[in-house]
């Protein structure tokens, strides 16, 4: 009778076991890789969100070094006209990259055209004029409404495929604007953010397939980055900074007012990855419109499919803020981020004069220190209630998990009959307020 236990030598038997385990591991890993990433509502996330490939500006066409086309390497004169001529020349000749070399170049509002890109070399700086006259009034979008106001330092409208690259700096030169704002507030406490005339740093409207990578975006007089009615915009490894104190001698606690890092206004498919943000207001902010009839205004709109990941926050008012000028935000993810000193991590601003709906928001894998993690309160600043009976606003399907922050106040939530808070979970457990 054959002894079946000895059919295979022990070494061969061990080899079979190892091969079997190896193949099983490969199968399991393949299944894991085959599982597509999803948004909080279960819909599949497009592969575009996993593409962190940096843009090589040398592949984008002819390089237009600004100093080769009449721009002086002189930091004392405003050269808006000369710089704009280089941009327009590049556009007229089929597109290309406007290159800023080492040195400081003072300018007012610049307008990029289809096919043009901006590359700022290490040691190069575009510095904004501190005279508002260098920013001509036009129809633009600001604070949840389309109106006459000032453009940004860098502007693009209706462009497909633009980039801002390089290890250089776009400096808003905001000190005089900040001090003028706080001086106005000292005698008119009710003045709005727009009352003191200030430009933003960058403004993209009606754009798509845009990448902003590696640049330093600092000292904006107003919002730092504002994108409106745009899609498929990537912010990769940017440094975004405005001082949070020490800019106003009568009150040294004051910082750069309303210097939001990235304002996402009625946009879809936005990626913010690997960025550092330290500003004297909110960091990533979702906007879309305000007012009693905001949902009937075609210039407004929702924010959907917004991914913020692997970012580092210094001092900010809110890491991720929905509102106050927001209508409908859906499928929003904040993950794998660290905060040094955020006032709040997730801030849901409930504006009582605006119909709002925030849904399918996930915050996960957050570390560091914050004064408050989740903050939900009515927002009544500049209240503009109109003649309309509004239904309650709503926040639902808000998920928080694997949160490892130090904080004296994890949840600061104020219920109201003006909004409904539903389907909140923390590490999978239901929350009630």
Model-derived segments and spans:
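Short coil/turn motifs at beta-sheet boundaries
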Residues: 147, 195, 356, 391-393
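Short charge-dense sequence patches
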Residues: 32-41, 186, 282, 310-318, ...
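Right-handed parallel beta-helix
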Residues: 122-123, 160-169, 208-219, 231-245, ...
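Glycine-rich beta-solenoid repeat tracts in large extracellular/virion proteins
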Residues: 109-112, 125, 129-130, 152-157, ...
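Electropositive phosphate-/nucleotide-binding environments in soluble metabolic enzymes
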Residues: 77-80, 302, 394
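Extracellular "leader-to-stem" segments immediately downstream of a signal peptide or signal-anchor
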Residues: 2-4, 11, 15, 19-20, ...
């Amino acid at each position: 009778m054959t002894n079946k236990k000895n059919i295979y030598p022990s070494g061969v038997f061990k080899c079979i076991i190892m091969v079997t385990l190896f193949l099983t591991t490969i199968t399991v890993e393949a299944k894991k890789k085959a599982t597509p990433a999803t948004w909080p509502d279960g819909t599949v996330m497009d592969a575009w969100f996993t593409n962190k490939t940096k843009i090589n500006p040398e592949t984008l066409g002819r390089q237009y070094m600004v100093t080769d086309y009449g721009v002086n390497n002189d930091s004392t004169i405003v050269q808006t006209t000369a710089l704009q001529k280089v941009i327009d020349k590049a556009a007229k000749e089929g597109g290309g990259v406007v290159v800023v070399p080492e040195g400081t170049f003072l300018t007012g509002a610049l307008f990029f055209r289809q096919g043009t890109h901006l590359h700022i070399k290490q040691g190069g700086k575009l510095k904004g004029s501190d005279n508002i006259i260098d920013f001509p009034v036009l129809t633009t979008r600001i604070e949840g409404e389309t109106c006459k106001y000032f453009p940004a330092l860098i502007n693009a409208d209706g462009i497909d495929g633009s980039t801002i690259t390089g290890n250089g700096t776009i400096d808003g030169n905001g000190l005089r604007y900040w001090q003028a704002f706080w001086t106005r507030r000292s005698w008119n406490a009710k003045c709005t953010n727009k009352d003191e005339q200030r430009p933003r740093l960058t403004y993209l409207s009606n754009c798509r397939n845009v990448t902003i990578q590696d640049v330093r975006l600092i000292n904006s007089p107003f919002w730092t980055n504002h994108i409106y009615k745009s899609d498929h915009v990537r912010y990769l490894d940017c440094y975004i900074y405005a001082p949070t104190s020490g800019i106003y001698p009568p009150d040294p606690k004051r910082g750069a007012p309303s210097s939001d890092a990235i304002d996402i206004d009625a946009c879809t498919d936005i990626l913010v990855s690997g960025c550092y943000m330290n500003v004297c207001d909110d960091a990533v902010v979702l906007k879309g419109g305000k007012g009693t009839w905001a949902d009937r205004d075609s210039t407004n709109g929702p924010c959907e499919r917004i991914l913020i990941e692997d970012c580092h926050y210094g001092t900010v008012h809110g890491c991720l803020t929905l509102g106050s000028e927001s209508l409908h935000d859906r499928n929003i993810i904040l993950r794998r981020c660290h905060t040094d000193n955020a006032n709040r991590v997730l801030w849901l601003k409930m504006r009582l004069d605006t119909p709002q709906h925030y849904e399918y928001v996930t915050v996960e894998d957050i570390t560091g220190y914050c004064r408050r993690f989740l903050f939900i309160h009515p927002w009544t600043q500049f209240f503009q209630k109109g003649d309309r009976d509004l239904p309650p606003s709503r926040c639902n399907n808000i998920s928080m998990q694997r949160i490892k922050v130090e904080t004296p106040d994890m949840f600061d939530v104020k219920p109201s009959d003006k909004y409904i808070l539903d389907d909140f979970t923390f590490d999978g457990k239901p929350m009630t307020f």
